Amino acid sequence: YYELAADILRNNPAEQAKFALESYLGGLNYSIAAKYEASNRMLNQALSVYAQMLPDRLDKYVDASIALCRNYGFTKEYGKALEILAKAEKQLPTGDKSDKMGEILRSRGSILYRQKQYAEAAANYQQAADIYKVLPGSDVKYQNALSSLNRCHTMMGNETAARQTEQDAERQRMAVLNRLLKENLEQLDAYRLQWGEDGLMYVSALGTIADIYYTQGQTDKALAYMEPFLSGETTALRNLFRLSKA
């Protein structure tokens, strides 16, 4: 499907953005199936088009670069992965503190970690953490960066730094859980009124709340939400299946 769409769009200059998107999605699809050669070919197609559309398509250019880097990481072509990231970073302003810069730093940290260059990996993860710490809506990415940083310090035998980053990552994990708990509790009644007690959104929120309370050690509260979750889960999934067949 993706190759056919790409061939059609390739011959229509006005549809370049669509061609690039089809190539990008096709590359992701092949990557999920572990067909990295086909994935790389399509991601490179997307990358070449997005490169011609800079700076308007900068976000897409970086996304395609990171996807390609991930593939090279899986196939242990680390030099190619780092080269792709370096090219993407050059497209960003000096001193950039955006989400895309954070993604580049995290991706580079991952490649360096695979190469057992733990100090260099830690430096990249630290920079990513510094970005995500103050970037709105990035609490989960901040947690992930701290966890990765902790692994680097652990591998280097930096006991004090490893202990500190472990505590920081756990503190951030609990902050994320509290935020998710608050959001789901606030939306629960609205989900029930809109979708009903066997609606997937309502049931999913019940499950999330129960899981968070259990993680926090609040067993009684977890059970209070787990019981209606279990009673509504089967019906919700059955309704979803029926809708998919309609």
What are these regions (language model features)?
Residues 17, 24, 66, 99, ...:
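TPR/TPR-like alpha-solenoid signature
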Residues 17, 59, 99, 140, ...:
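Residue signature of alpha-solenoid helical repeat architecture, marking inter-repeat boundaries
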Residues 20-21, 60-63, 103, 144, ...:
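Residue register of alpha-helical TPR repeats
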